[in-house]
Structures are given as structure tokens and as C-alpha cells.
């Protein structure tokens, strides 16, 4: 079963647009970027991702998203099926 996660990104001041564009262009063999949105509020960019397993999702976040220039901090929320 695929793992779906939402990566909430805090960007450096004035860098949200550039971070969103860079993340949109990321190519990683372990996971797929499904959607990237710049948003208002405590986070600047929200990324929806899918991977075959949790390790692959984590690798894409640490090797890809967290290395994008302008990314200060990430918080990852995993999608779960309840009930």
C-alpha cells in the first residue's frame, strides 16, 4: 500500500514562491510529488507526496525537500485511514 504524506514547509522570508517552484521540479526515484501549494498562515508551502513505503517518503523529504534553498523547517503529516 502506498504511503501519502503532507509536508508543511516554513520558508525563509520572501522565498515561498521560489521554494514552491523548486519543490515542484524535484525528481526523486523513491517518491512522487503529487501537488504543491503556496499558502498563508504558519506554513508557506504544502506538498502532497506519495511513496511505496515510509522510508522512501522520508528519503525524498530529507534528500530532496530539506535541501532546497530557502527551506527553513519541515513538518510531515502522514495520511491514515480511520475506521
Question: Could you tell me what each predicted segment is?
Answer:
Residues 1-83:
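A compositional/biophysical signature of low hydrophobicity enriched in polar/charged and small residues
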Amino acid at each position: 500500500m502506498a504511503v501519502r504524506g503532507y509536508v508543511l514547509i516554513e520558508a525563509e522570508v520572501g522565498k515561498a514562491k521560489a521554494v514552491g517552484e523548486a519543490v515542484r521540479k524535484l525528481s526523486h526515484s523513491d517518491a512522487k510529488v503529487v501537488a504543491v501549494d503556496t499558502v498563508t498562515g504558519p506554513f508557506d508551502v504544502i506538498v502532497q507526496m506519495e511513496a511505496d513505503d515510509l522510508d522512501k517518503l522520508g528519503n525524498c523529504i530529507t534528500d530532496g525537500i530539506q535541501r532546497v534553498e530557502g527551506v527553513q523547517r519541515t513538518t510531515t503529516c502522514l495520511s491514515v485511514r480511520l475506521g
